[in-house]
């Protein structure tokens, strides 16, 4: 219960109040106090119920002589042959139309049956869009590139291999350990928010074999629900009546210094704006190899055939 320590009232002279009004004020005050106390004492929902400390390996303990493994992400079917000819160890497919995944998987296996092929999920997944996952399963890939927690939950018990992508934002040993264990992921892509020094710190604190590093790519700068293609290149209002201009037009946005940045749509009609200038971390390769990292990735955008090689 509660005990009133003091009370100060400032009322006009001659005012008469029934006792019921005072009781109402007392009850309202008690309810407000109880609400505040419950909010202060309630446990934080995101707090782990027990201490969770990932195991760590000292520098150089994670098989530094392991051969490097190179995976390549393709965004167009015609990129597949040159990527396989160049000697990729694994292929990730990230197509706008998920219905093309089955043909992409077939193309990889016809060209190089021993090369594993992974299919990328959308960055964002709404509850009504689990049909995308079923479509990916029917393509019969070797594995899935997990880009959101809904995909991690859906494929958690799948026999397919599961790789965590950059959008899971693995930036410290705790997030890496939780996602790898709870999501049953084979390995994780390091967050794009980390600089080279921070990547090195994470590799020293966590088993390097947990990770893959995107070494060369056009950095995704914005991912948005708004569809530029539908808004400016059609008279429609959604995928039902826009006529799919994203399948016919190549769109780039020009920034204030004249640089062109490619814009791509995904299966959910969400748009991603990519940096028109490729970013590479090749200069840090030897240092990361010395720290035990062996998995690296190259991501293609609309690269010409000569650059793909």
Predicted regions and their residues:
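Active-site pocket-lining/capping segments in soluble small-molecule metabolic enzymes
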Residues: 1-307
């Amino acid at each position: 219960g509660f005990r009133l320590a003091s009370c100060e009232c400032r009322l006009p002279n001659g005012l008469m109040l029934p006792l019921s009004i005072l009781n109402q004020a007392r009850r309202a005050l008690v309810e407000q106090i109880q609400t505040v106390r419950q909010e202060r004492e309630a446990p934080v929902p995101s707090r782990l119920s027990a201490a969770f400390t990932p195991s760590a390996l000292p520098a150089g303990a994670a098989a530094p002589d392991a051969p490097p493994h190179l995976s390549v992400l393709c965004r167009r079917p015609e990129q597949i042959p040159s990527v396989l000819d160049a000697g990729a160890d694994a292929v990730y497919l990230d197509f706008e139309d998920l219905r093309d995944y089955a043909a992409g998987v077939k193309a990889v296996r016809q060209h190089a049956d021993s090369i594993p092929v992974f299919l990328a999920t959308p960055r964002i997944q709404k509850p009504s869009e689990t049909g995308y996952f079923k479509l990916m399963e029917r393509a019969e890939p070797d594995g899935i590139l997990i880009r959101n927690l809904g995909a991690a939950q859906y494929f958690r018990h799948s026999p397919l291999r599961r790789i965590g992508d950059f959008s899971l934002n693995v930036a410290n040993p705790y997030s890496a350990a939780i996602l790898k264990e709870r999501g049953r992921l084979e390995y994780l892509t390091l967050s794009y928010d980390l600089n080279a020094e921070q990547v090195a710190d994470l590799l020293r604190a966590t088993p390097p074999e947990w990770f893959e590093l995107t070494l060369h790519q056009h950095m995704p700068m914005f991912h948005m629900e708004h569809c530029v293609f539908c808004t400016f290149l059609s008279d429609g209002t959604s995928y039902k009546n826009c006529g799919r201009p994203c399948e016919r037009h190549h769109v780039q946005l020009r920034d204030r210094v004249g640089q062109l940045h490619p814009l791509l749509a995904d299966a959910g009609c969400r748009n991603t704006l990519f940096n028109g200038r490729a970013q590479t971390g090749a200069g840090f390769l030897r240092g990361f190899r010395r720290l035990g990292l062996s998995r690296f990735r190259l991501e293609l955008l609309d690269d010409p055939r000569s650059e793909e090689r």
